[in-house]
Regions:
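Short amphipathic alpha-helix initiation/capping segments at coil-to-helix junctions
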Residues: 139-147, 151
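Active-site lining segments that contact anionic ligands and/or coordinate catalytic metals
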Residues: 26, 40, 119-121, 145, ...
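Gram-negative outer-membrane beta-barrel transporters
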Residues: 45-50, 62-135, 159, 168
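C-terminal beta-signal and adjacent terminal beta-strands/loops
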Residues: 51, 86, 128-133, 148-193
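Outer-membrane beta-barrel signature, preferentially recognizing the C-terminal barrel domain
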Residues: 1-79, 100-105, 136-140, 180
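Residues on the lipid-exposed face of transmembrane beta-strands in outer-membrane beta-barrel proteins
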Residues: 29-33, 74-78, 88, 110-114, ...
Length: 193
């Protein structure tokens, strides 16, 4: 059970004082296993049944009515070396709602985190989304984002970092009317005292 927030009811352009509370029952089962120090896996299945989920459609907060969401999530982790961690996840969602925003049918993630030395850390990830509903006037979105981060601990108090996000310059939308940024590069210094 969740009452609409003050923001959902009264603030900004999406406000809707007629919103009803959300009700939901969620069932989840999960099993995980570490096969060795090198490999671990888990599987989670879920079933969710509810009424009046609050979402934003056509720039207004609305209740969805009755819904059933069910899906499965798979996860693998590996430590082939003490300095390297690999991870992979996949998620599938089936929903009874044709227009459920912000909930892609398929998602995956592949990640690598390498501690190249005591001072240098390099991580990369690939995040993919398929079948994301945005609006009836926008095609369902499917995209992949490749990201890279390099961090160097220059001294006890300072870490220099660089991030490259959306390296492949994928074009996608997650909210109607708001294109997401293409390739982005940023860097900085993080100070710890």
């Amino acid at each position: 059970y969740r009452n609409p927030s003050f923001r959902e009811l009264y603030l900004y352009r999406m406000a809707n004082p007629e919103l009803e509370p959300e009700t939901m029952m969620n069932y989840e089962i999960s099993v995980g296993k570490s096969f060795s120090r090198y490999l671990g896996a888990s599987v989670t299945a879920y079933y969710c049944k509810g009424d009046n989920m609050i979402q934003t459609l056509d720039m207004k907060n609305q209740n969805t009515g009755r819904f059933i969401n069910k899906g499965v999530e798979l996860s693998l982790t590996s430590h082939p070396f003490s300095s390297l961690m690999l991870s992979a996840t996949y998620s599938y969602l089936h929903t009874s709602l044709e227009n459920l925003t912000g909930a892609p049918r398929n998602q995956y993630y592949l990640g690598a985190d390498w501690h190249a030395s005591d001072r240098l850390n390099i991580s990369a990830d690939l995040k993919g989304v398929g079948g994301l509903y945005v609006h009836e006037s926008v095609d369902r979105q499917s995209y992949a984002l490749l990201n890279l981060k390099v961090a160097y601990q220059a001294c006890r108090y300072a870490c220099v970092f660089m991030r490259l996000e959306n390296i492949t310059d994928s074009r996608y939308v997650i909210n109607r009317g708001y294109d997401m940024p293409g390739f982005t590069a940023l860097g900085g210094v993080k100070l710890n005292f």
